[in-house]
């Protein structure tokens, strides 16, 4: 027998004497052998012999998921229980905790607490484990009547005197007052008289002494830790044991990505679930789903208003409105002028740009104009802040109704850009468009304008470009009936509906034209750059422009006369006539544009053209007469410091009526593969 006999259990005296003879007098060390068995606590049989490690009938020890720090340092087998058997025998049960593994490279920035594995599918809570009493054999006893289960358990068993994580009924609003769920001193305090209607059905069957108070006996409340932990996978119904991950951090991240992906197209009832909103007082709020009856995370039961980390002040700031209102409005942070607002009046003009606030609470998911009745919004001023400071700890009015979130889904959310928000919806397009657009008459008007303005040589160049695509237009439209043409116009209006939002959000001078060259949409920046008003470009106001890019009248050189568009509009009385794109460009730029359009109209559907051009400033007859007197002032303006602000942009092209620009445009086709509209972005080359 070798010296390893010291690790076995005591043997009979005869065997011990034989061992002393074989080992050459080991001495008294063999009288008190050490038992190094740990984990399951099974010791070898008292036979005087150590079990053969290669014996297949030898009982196998269950491998622990993570060894404690002491066993990890000693390279010994540990168990899942804390404290483990070895630390108990060595008197180190108070310092027994999980050892720290070496992190993978992709987890070097992850906190150590996030890498802690779950035990039996349940969330591991150090506070819960430290408060549990020790049983006789040194193991933690949650409840003597609780039966062990090998399957993952995400729902606390009703036999234990605990508080159910998944509630079936609504929480009482005044039952809890807490700090942030990530606070180290996060505790829960309950009012015993106020929890009759707040706890779940299984908790109501418990004795009145059992509650969720932090001062409750730890032996009766195994869930004495934080009631809500954002890293708890049970709150999202994540079964970490079914995911083949070696650490909790990676499994939780993978599960959260799947949770977000599967909730992208949920119904309105699941909109709060895909947001993952946080409940009041830092706790998760739950309500039963209509299908399975199980609890779903993220819903606000009973119409309660969720708090942001349990702070009523942050909640009132995010809503930005009194508690008497029934809807949460994003625009409440920046209200209109004259309604108790602290925003200056010049920032709330209809033409002034507005910024929108992005909140961190559930109120940011509400539609800007989702209310069903007019209401007055109040801003975040000093009076509101002072009243919120002196309010109750729960921050809710005793009689006021709870605000509700009315957003159906995040993908249908519309952001409020300004006060002049479009009030129509896309369905109005399909209801109002009853007639096809008269493209034939518009092409005739374009031909008459080109013949009247341009010289015969340039008119011929433009006519050749349009004639090259004329057969393609005839071939694609000869099979279309009236219903198809009406549908074509609906497609145009619906596409224009989307482009208007892009134009308002983009700071680049942009215009959108029909295939005839008529302006259909224009951005504010383009009007600032060229001086053309939006109503004039869209045909809502008369066009009094006389600038055709020729010489200045009275300069001594001959220039081709041009009749204002009033005579053209007279050919179609009673109907407004939008401005043609050819009226915004000089002669050479118009010829180049139609040559490129003939190549791109039925060619590359994804192609675009990027080149330079000269845009014409909007000038009336009075402006042209006063232009010679202002040339000296314009020259001195350039010597002082170049272009600055909107006033400086208006001075571009002041001298000769032309603006040197670089522009890019493309052709958008409809469902019949016919050129539908032209989208153009321009930028002045004089801006530095």
UniProtKB/Swiss-Prot annotation:
SMART domains cross-referenced by the UniProt entry: GAL4
Would I find Calcium among this entry's keywords? no
Where's the DNA-binding part?
68-96
Recorded GO MF terms: DNA-binding transcription factor activity, RNA polymerase II-specific; RNA polymerase II transcription regulatory region sequence-specific DNA binding; zinc ion binding
Q: Spans of biased composition, class Low complexity?
A: 547-559
Gene Ontology CC: one annotated term: nucleus
Any GO BP: gluconeogenesis
Quick one: where's region Disordered?
Answer: 1-61, 137-162, 174-228, 264-302, 547-574
Q: Output this protein's name.
A: Transcription activator of gluconeogenesis acuK
Q: Which organism is it from?
A: Aspergillus oryzae (strain ATCC 42149 / RIB 40)
Species lineage: Eukaryota, Fungi, Dikarya, Ascomycota, Pezizomycotina
User: Which gene codes for it?
Assistant: acuK
């Amino acid at each position: 027998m070798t010296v390893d006999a010291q690790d076995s259990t005591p043997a009979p005296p005869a065997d011990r004497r034989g061992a002393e003879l074989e080992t050459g007098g080991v001495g008294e060390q063999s009288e008190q052998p050490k038992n190094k068995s740990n984990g399951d606590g099974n010791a070898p049989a008292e036979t005087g012999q150590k079990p053969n490690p290669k014996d297949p009938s030898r009982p196998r020890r269950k491998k622990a998921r993570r060894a404690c720090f002491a066993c990890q340092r000693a390279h010994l087998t540990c168990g899942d229980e804390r404290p483990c058997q070895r630390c108990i025998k060595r008197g180190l049960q108070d310092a027994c905790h999980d050892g720290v593994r070496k992190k993978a490279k992709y987890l070097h920035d992850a906190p150590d607490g996030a890498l802690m594995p779950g035990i039996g599918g349940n969330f591991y809570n150090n506070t819960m484990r430290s408060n549990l009493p020790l049983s006789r054999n040194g193991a933690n006893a949650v409840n003597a009547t609780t039966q062990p289960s090998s399957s993952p358990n995400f729902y606390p068993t009703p036999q234990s005197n605990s508080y159910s994580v998944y509630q079936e009924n609504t929480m009482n609003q005044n039952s809890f007052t807490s700090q942030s769920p990530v606070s180290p001193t996060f505790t829960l305090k309950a009012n015993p008289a106020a929890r009759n209607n707040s706890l779940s059905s299984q908790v109501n069957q418990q004795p009145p002494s059992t509650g969720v108070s932090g001062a409750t006996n730890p032996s009766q409340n195994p869930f004495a830790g934080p009631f809500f932990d954002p890293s708890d996978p049970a709150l999202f119904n994540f079964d970490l044991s079914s995911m083949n991950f070696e650490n909790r951090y990676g499994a939780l991240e993978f599960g959260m990505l799947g949770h977000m992906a599967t909730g992208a197209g949920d119904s309105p009832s699941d909109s709060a679930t895909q947001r993952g909103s946080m409940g009041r007082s830092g706790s998760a709020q739950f309500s039963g789903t209509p299908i399975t009856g199980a609890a779903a995370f993220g819903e606000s039961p009973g119409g309660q208003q969720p708090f942001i980390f349990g702070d009523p002040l942050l909640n009132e700031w995010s809503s930005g409105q009194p508690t008497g209102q029934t809807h949460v409005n994003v625009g409440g942070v920046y209200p209109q002028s004259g309604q108790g607002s602290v925003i200056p009046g010049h920032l709330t003009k209809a033409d002034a740009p507005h910024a929108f606030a992005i909140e961190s609470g559930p109120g940011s998911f509400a539609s800007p104009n989702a209310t069903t009745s007019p209401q007055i919004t109040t801003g975040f001023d000093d009076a509101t802040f002072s009243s919120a400071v002196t309010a109750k700890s729960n921050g809710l009015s005793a009689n006021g109704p709870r605000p509700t979130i009315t957003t159906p889904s995040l993908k249908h959310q519309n952001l409020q850009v300004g006060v002049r928000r479009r009030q129509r919806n896309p369905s109005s397009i399909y209801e109002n468009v009853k007639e096809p657009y008269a493209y034939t008459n518009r092409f005739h008007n374009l031909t008459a304008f080109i013949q009247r303005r341009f010289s015969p040589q340039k008119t011929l160049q433009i006519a050749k470009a349009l004639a090259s695509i004329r057969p393609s237009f005839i071939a694609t439209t000869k099979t279309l009936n009236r219903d198809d043409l009406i549908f074509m116009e609906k497609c145009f209006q619906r596409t224009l509906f989307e482009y208007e939002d892009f134009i308002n959000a983009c700071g680049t001078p942009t215009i959108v034209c029909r295939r005839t060259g008529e302006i259909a949409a224009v951005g504010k920046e383009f009007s600032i750059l060229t001086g053309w008003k939006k109503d004039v470009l869209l045909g809502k106001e008369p066009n009094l422009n006389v600038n055709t890019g020729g010489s200045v009248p009275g300069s001594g050189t001959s220039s081709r006369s041009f009749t204002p568009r009033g005579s053209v509009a007279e050919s179609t009385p009673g109907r407004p006539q939008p401005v043609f794109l050819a009226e915004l460009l000089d002669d050479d730029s118009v010829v180049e544009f139609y040559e490129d359009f003939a190549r791109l109209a039925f060619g590359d559907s994804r192609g675009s053209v990027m080149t330079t051009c000269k845009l014409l400033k909007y000038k009336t007859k009075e402006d042209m007469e006063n232009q010679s007197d202002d040339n000296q002032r314009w020259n001195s303006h350039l010597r002082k410091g170049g272009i600055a602000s909107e006033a400086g942009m208006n001075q571009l092209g002041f001298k000769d009526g032309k603006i040197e620009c670089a522009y890019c445009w493309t052709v958008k086709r409809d469902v019949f593969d016919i050129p539908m509209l032209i989208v153009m972005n321009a930028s002045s080359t004089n801006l530095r």
